[in-house]
Each structure stands twice: as C-alpha cells, then as structure tokens.
Amino acid sequence: MIDFETEYTPFKTTSHDWRTDIFDGLTFPPLGNPPNRKVLNVFQPDFCRPVQLRYNRTVSKFGFDMLHEYVLKLIDVEQCPQMDETCPEADKLDITKCLSAEIPTETVFLSKPHMYGHNSSLTNINFQPDFNKHESTIYFEPISGTPVRAQLRIQLSTNAWIDRLRLNPDGSTE
C-alpha cells in the first residue's frame, strides 16, 4: 500500500499502520483457482480507510469461462484491525474525519444503498434491497488477478446538526 495523507484533514496513514496486507486498488495479486485469497483489503482514499472484498463465488460471465466474484464488505478497521474473513460487517462507517477536521464526528456515514445488509429491521421499513440492485461486486480473472468488471454501489448519509442562533433584543446574533 502507498502512504496517504490529504491536505483537507489531518488524517494520514502509512503501510506500517496496518496489521494485514492492504492493496492500493491499482494492482491485485494472482488469486488462483480455487481462490487462495478469500479476502482482499483495498485502501480507499475517498473514505480514508480500507474496504474489504470477500470471495463470493466463481462464475462464467462477460465472455470468460471463469471469474472470481468478490463482494464489498464494510469492515470497521478500528473494531476488527486484522481485517480477515471473520470480521463482522458494519452497518455504516463514520468517514467524517476524512472529509473535514472542522465538522463533528459521526456526521457523514458510508453504507450500502438502502442499508442493504443492515441488520436492523427498525431502519429497513419498506426497503427491499436485493443483491443484483444494491451489492457492490468486482470480477477478477483468477490467474492474473486482473479486475474485469466492477460496480460500486454505496450510499453517503449525514446526520443533521442544528446549531441554533440566539437572537438578541437588538437584533444581533450569538
């Protein structure tokens, strides 16, 4: 993985900060057949954290006899730093620190569309997300590890913070 820092926030990281292999999203290892890597962790600079791709199945698609299908898993690296296949998927990830150091934490969240895969029935009222419409997938050629086709489907949500102004009798505000 390459080192990362941004001019917009104080967030920065180096490859030595991680307890596992993390790829930069430009190159991937050969995967083998059957796949010898069930998990690929990819650092995503837009979110200032790695995202996980997990092996789902082997398919015949797009003119190829055999492709390995991997699906996106949102793993909270702070809760599961080893980033392996035993890590539970988070419902949402707080990415506020990647966007700005000036807005409160827990303001901007990353999730799957319509909270696909979310485990709370309270927030899934009338949502009927399905794999074909809402899952992020990437298909790899197994021998070279070359990505053939990918579709990234994510949702950004924000918490609305209300900062009430006080109106003074003279019309000024605090």
Explain the meaning of each model-derived region:
Residues M1-D65, L72-E174:
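Extracellular or lumenal secretory-pathway regions
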